[in-house]
Amino acid sequence: MDKNEALRTFTTGENFHLQHYLGAHQEEVDGKVGYSFRVWAPNAQSVHLIGDFTNWYENQIPMARNEAGVWEVFTDLPKEGDIYKYNVKRSSGQEILKIDPLAVYLEERPGTGAVIRTIPEKKWKDGLWLARRKRWGFFSRPVNIYEVHAGSWKRNEDGSPYSFAQLKEDLIPYLVEMNYTHVEFMPLMAHPLGLSWGYQLMGYFAFEHTYGTPEEFQDFVEECHLNNIGVIVDWVPGHFTINDDALAYYDGTPTFEYQDHDRAHNYGWGALNFDLGKNQVQSFLISSIKFWIDFYHLDGIRVDAVSNMLYLDYDSGPWQPNKDGGNRNYEGYYFLQRLNTVIKLAHPDVMMIAEESSSGTKITGMRELGGLGFDYKWNMGWMNDILRFYEEDPIYRKYDFNLVTFSFMYVFSENFLLPFSHDEVVHGKKSLMHKMWGDRYNQFAGLRNLLTYQICHPGKKLLFMGSEFGQFLEWKSEEQLEWSNLDDEMNKKMQGFTATLNAFYKDNRPLWEIDLSYDGIEIIDADNVDQSVLSFIRKTEKGDMLICVFNMAPVERKNFTIGVPVAAVYEEVWNTELEEWGGVWKEHNETVQSQEGLWKDYPQTLTFTLPALGASIWKIKRRIKSKSTKNKK
């Protein structure tokens, strides 16, 4: 689109490729090759371009303002690699140096200047992956995500984080070995503190240089795709860093943030909230995420802190009701609908995932029916309930068995993703393994049971790094994972267990083919409170099934009986208590032939030994003839 159309659509909130208009761009004007610079600062008294090519303040270049509040200038002084900023004079007369909000490259800390660099055109080799992704989608495919903080998965001997060139060599083989389908990174956009988690951003188009270069991340994504691994990145469109040299009060007045002081300030996080109803902000944010999807070939976006965008009273600070007297933030609601509409029109096969904890808004519902249009929502209720249950002494579990079963009441009210994320292994919450009840042996048994339950429960899966091998200490963002734990036999066996469990998940269609309706699950018994045993069936469209049985008590149950719908010889295909994974069983249960006899609504029974704190999964090995009628369900 030409410059006039780019400017018009920016002001109407319809420019979703803003990086082609604002920022620095190499152009030829009147026979001179140079760079055009454009920045939105509608209420600034003046804006000057300064940088290496002006000797900074000595020869700063004045910029001209157009009718939409965009300041621009063309100059042939800059060269590739030069650093620049905008010197913005506010209405008060104060001058302040600001970053270029559209910069793709920022200088290394402690500086925050933008770097003039021509974005190279990558010749991608992942066409087959993208074609398969488009053909298959993801709703009826396995999705098992390994969540990673790029700065602390592994570190160099000098304590510096791995670059993505290093992660390409180490992390991708690990993902393949561990049989994950996707990897999700905490924010990779530029943020002020390199050792932070990255959720207060300053550069929405810039790659965080702590982790290397944009080109290195492109190569990482490509290599993931060549190894059949999808890549998801966290994105924060609700709030941004309060740092003076970034987006905050860019021209001296509320520019990217709300006009109202209390709405603009996120008191709980010490950040500023985007004015999601402002057209220019919508163009900026949607352009940001489209750029990341297009430039890096991302397979999914996890939108952080959605509740903060939906509810006026989400923060701990003062708030004012909306025009209807309620707490709904209509600007945030409509922005998220529009965001998903735009992304889905361009990339229907890219996952849009919401981190959202309330039940007051339909997050994954159809936009036409009032939903927000996300593909998945984190199931925070399930996660909180299930962790509380597994931390509890088994003596009391029968009184709280509803913590395990309650999710079946609402499991398909949204398209859920089941997260054991970074948020659950910090700030004194203990690591996932350390949360488990009992001594060291029982903690590992509990963790094997828990991860198997997550894999069998309807919904896509996410596990934060370190939990796969039972790291004992909490996650520390300034240190690498406790890889030395793997010198311990129990941790090494736990790692092998998780890798095998992930492969089992991928190889068994009943666990993922029907994740969005009750057609994919049938409860056998959710009422065995006294023994703390839960059993259900996962199914495919063709009727293939897995019988999943979970013993949440440290008591081995011999001659344990459940009902099954089909007369058959059944074989145990999964047992969490095998010796090779740290348990005490030397081998699986023997195959068992079902017996005729009514058990609840089931015409057949299956009797076997259920391991203590164990999970046992069975499948049909061979059907047999029976006079009994099939289960009426």
From Swiss-Prot:
Pathway: Glycan biosynthesis; glycogen biosynthesis. It catalyses: Transfers a segment of a (1->4)-alpha-D-glucan chain to a primary hydroxy group in a similar glucan chain. InterPro entries: A-amylase/branching_C, Branching_enzy, GlgB, GlgB_N_E_set_prok, Glyco_hydro_13_cat_dom, Glyco_hydro_13_N, Glyco_hydro_b, Glycoside_hydrolase_SF. It comes from the Bacteria. Keywords: Carbohydrate metabolism, Glycogen biosynthesis, Glycogen metabolism, Glycosyltransferase, Transferase. One of its GO terms (cellular component) is cytosol. It holds the Pfam family CBM_48. Monomer. Belongs to the glycosyl hydrolase 13 family. GlgB subfamily. Catalyzes the formation of the alpha-1,6-glucosidic linkages in glycogen by scission of a 1,4-alpha-linked oligosaccharide from growing alpha-1,4-glucan chains and the subsequent attachment of the oligosaccharide to the alpha-1,6 position. This is 1,4-alpha-glucan branching enzyme GlgB. It comes from Streptococcus gordonii (strain Challis / ATCC 35105 / BCRC 15272 / CH1 / DL1 / V288). The lineage of its organism: Bacteria, Bacillati, Bacillota, Bacilli, Lactobacillales. The gene is glgB.
